[in-house]
């Protein structure tokens, strides 16, 4: 039986590829997709969700737009990474259907209410929508199996010295998620920087030769350009968000540990830092399954296999 999931995302090149992977996987039943502000402004990320689902011929999946800004600060976007549209590079179709006439929180709450079984939330952007859901619908917490997020890091940041982008955009929301009591699975930079896509992998995807694999290759062409900056020391481009979906499909290719994680919401130098109690110093019970490593070759193979689904 397929695992029911909802995806809250801010497309974004890697969010788009996470959607491609999820919708090529019969092991998963995507019940809804909601858009968060983050990589681009909320109207652009919502449009990008609709464009991707149009490309993938999935107008049956309900879509809704979310919060326009983080809980307690102005919105920060990553247009230097993802371009003016949020999905610069390929030529994507215009949306062929409209979003639901409700908010992301209302859509997620409706799906949880109607589901006969618990639902996994996958959040690949800032955690604003998820935090608002948790705050406004405590009666639905028991219907959430787990929250799988892309965000944070045990070590270095990628937007501030100590903070990863998604957590930095809305640290208060992320802290609410980690301390919610709902199991969290964290794909942070520790693992996503090991999930690099190399130029040869992009050509492999391109050679699959269907319209979706071609667009994924073109998305990665654009995404690769930003990551060529010498400061990163990368051979390729880290494919952050698809790690969440890949973990649901093949957890055995990931190395994980169980630890307590909190988010620094106020630090002068560390706002947005995910504080990982690696040595169990706080006495707090672990609240997070933390991904630390991935079999990169198996990860790329999984992507290639699922891209062939769109033939």
From Swiss-Prot:
One of its GO terms (cellular component) is cytosol. The active site is at residue 240. Pfam families: IU_nuc_hydro. Gene3D superfamilies: Ribonucleoside hydrolase-like. InterPro entries: I/U_nuclsd_hydro_CS, Inosine/uridine_hydrolase_dom, IUNH, Pyrim_hydro_RihA, Ribo_hydro-like. Keywords: Glycosidase, Hydrolase. Coiled coil: none annotated. It comes from the Bacteria. The keyword Hydrolase applies. The keyword Nucleotide-binding does not apply. One of its GO terms (biological process) is nucleobase-containing small molecule interconversion. GO terms for molecular function: purine nucleosidase activity; uridine nucleosidase activity. It is an enzyme of class 3 (hydrolase). Its EC number is 3.2.-.-. HAMAP family: Pyrim_hydro_RihA. Belongs to the IUNH family. RihA subfamily. NCBIfam families: PRK10443.1. Hydrolyzes cytidine or uridine to ribose and cytosine or uracil, respectively. This is Pyrimidine-specific ribonucleoside hydrolase RihA.
């Amino acid at each position: 039986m397929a695992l029911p999931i909802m995806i809250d995302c801010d497309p974004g090149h890697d969010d788009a590829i996470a959607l491609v992977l999820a919708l090529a996987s019969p092991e998963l039943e995507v019940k809804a997709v909601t858009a968060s502000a983050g990589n681009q402004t909320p109207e652009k990320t919502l449009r990008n969700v609709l464009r991707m689902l149009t490309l993938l011929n999935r107008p049956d999946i309900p879509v809704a737009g979310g919060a326009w800004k983080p809980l307690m600060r102005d919105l920060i976007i990553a247009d230097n990474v993802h371009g003016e549209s949020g999905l610069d590079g390929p030529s994507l179709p215009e949306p062929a259907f409209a979003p639901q006439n409700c908010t992301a929180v209302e859509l997620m709450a409706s799906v949880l209410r109607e589901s006969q079984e618990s639902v996994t939330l996958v959040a690949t952007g800032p955690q604003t929508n998820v935090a608002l859901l948790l705050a406004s619908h405590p009666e639905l917490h028991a219907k959430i199996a787990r929250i799988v997020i892309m965000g944070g890091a045990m070590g270095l940041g990628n937007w501030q010295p100590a903070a990863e982008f998604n957590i930095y955009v809305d640290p208060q929301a992320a802290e609410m998620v980690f301390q919610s009591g709902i199991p969290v699975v964290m794909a942070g930079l520790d693992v996503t920087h090991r999930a690099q896509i190399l130029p040869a992998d992009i050509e492999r995807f391109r050679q699959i030769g269907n319209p979706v694999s071609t667009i994924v290759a073109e998305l990665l062409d654009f995404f690769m350009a930003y990551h060529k900056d010498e400061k990163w020391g990368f051979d390729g481009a880290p494919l952050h968000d698809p790690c969440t979906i890949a973990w649901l499909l093949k957890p055995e290719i990931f190395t994980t540990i169980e630890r307590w994680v909190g988010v620094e919401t106020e630090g002068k130098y560390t706002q947005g830092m995910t504080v990982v109690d690696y040595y169990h110093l706080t006495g707090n019970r672990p609240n997070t399954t933390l991904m630390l490593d991935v079999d990169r070759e198996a990860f790329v193979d999984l992507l290639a296999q699922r891209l062939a689904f769109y033939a």
